[in-house]
Structures are given as structure tokens and as C-alpha cells.
Amino acid sequence: MNAPKEGDYIAIQSYKHDGSLHRTWRDTMVLKTSENAVIGCNDHTLVTESDGRKWVTREPALIYFHKKYWFNVVAMIREGGVSYYCNLASPHVMDQEALKYIDYDLDVKVFPNGEKRLLDVDEYEAHSAKWHYSAETDRILKANVKVLVDWINNGKGPFSKEYIDIWYNRYQELAHHR
């Protein structure tokens, strides 16, 4: 499959460990692709939940996926500052249909003031027991929480102001030329 190009729109599909579709985001504009990473942006995009419920995102969000890390990052650009929602998840794959990954329940939320919260630990434990997450998967996910927290604490990659400025400005340029 040819990698999507800058300005192309892709869908994003989140699955659970058992292979069931969890959530779909309809339109994300690709801002950059490389061998390992995808950076994109969506704004007021349609989201469909596994139970069929639909809703629309409220603000622009930059997305970051990397094939070597077991997390992805959503930077929500709001009036009061940037909030981050980080999913502990498998590295992504891309096919003709969508960018796809397995959501492993654990999430890290970062507020504009820098406060961090680890979310959905109970959901992770329940699904781990239900779907028999391997010890290796558990080890990888816990190691990636540490990498993610290091990135957050040190303003690396998507957690830097420069990253947000560069990629959100690029999104605005591309969106206004359509």
C-alpha cells in the first residue's frame, strides 16, 4: 500500500485485544508520514463507537503514532491550553482502509497545567484477565508508560510547544488551501 501523502485524509480505527472494533475517527488529515511515524490533525471529525453511537470532536487535535512505541498521543488544542490524551496501544499498522491499532485500555491524560493522570487501570486489569494479555504484553505496556511519562516530563516530541505550533500551523495552511 502507498503511504498517505501530506493533505490526504485517513480514517483511524481502534480495536480491542480480542479483535473487536472499538472506535473509528472518520477524517484525519495527514501532515507527515515517515517509515515509522504518522502525524495528523482532525477537527470536528465524526467518531463512531463500537455500539454505534456517534459524536463529533469539539476541537482540533494533533495525532502522533509511531511504529516503535506502544502508545499514541492526541494533543487537543483548546482555548485554555493544550491537553493530551495518550493511549497505551500497539504500534499502528496502515492499510487501504485505515490506520489501525489495538487499544490496551490504559491512558495518560495531561492537563494544560502539566498535571498527569493514569486512567482506566481497572479496565486494563479486567480486560487483561478476560482476554489473557501475555506477561510480555504487560511488560511492554508498563515499560512504555515509563517512556511516555519521560516524554511528557521532558517536553519531548508531541509534548513540546514547538511541535504543537509547527504542526497545527501546517494543518491550518493545508486546510485553508482546500
Curated annotation (Swiss-Prot):
Catalytic reaction(s) noted: a ribonucleoside 5'-triphosphate + H2O = a ribonucleoside 5'-diphosphate + phosphate + H(+); a ribonucleoside 5'-diphosphate + H2O = a ribonucleoside 5'-phosphate + phosphate + H(+)
Active-site residues, Swiss-Prot/TrEMBL: 23
InterPro entries: DUF402 (IPR007295), FomD-like_sf (IPR035930), Ntdp-like (IPR050212), SA1684 (IPR016882)
Keywords tagged on the record: Hydrolase, Magnesium, Metal-binding
Superkingdom of origin: Bacteria
Annotated GO MF terms: magnesium ion binding; nucleoside diphosphate phosphatase activity; ribonucleoside triphosphate phosphatase activity
Cofactor: Mg(2+)
Classification via Pfam families: DUF402
Residues that, per the record, bind Mg(2+) 2: 105, 107, 120, 123
Residues that coordinate or bind Mg(2+) 1: 87, 103, 107
EC number from the UniProt entry: 3.6.1.15, 3.6.1.6
Record's function text: Has nucleoside phosphatase activity towards nucleoside triphosphates and nucleoside diphosphates.
Recorded family membership: Belongs to the Ntdp family.
NCBIfam families cross-referenced by the UniProt entry: PRK13662.1 (NF010183)
Protein name: Nucleoside triphosphate/diphosphate phosphatase
Organism: Latilactobacillus sakei subsp. sakei (strain 23K) (Lactobacillus sakei subsp. sakei)
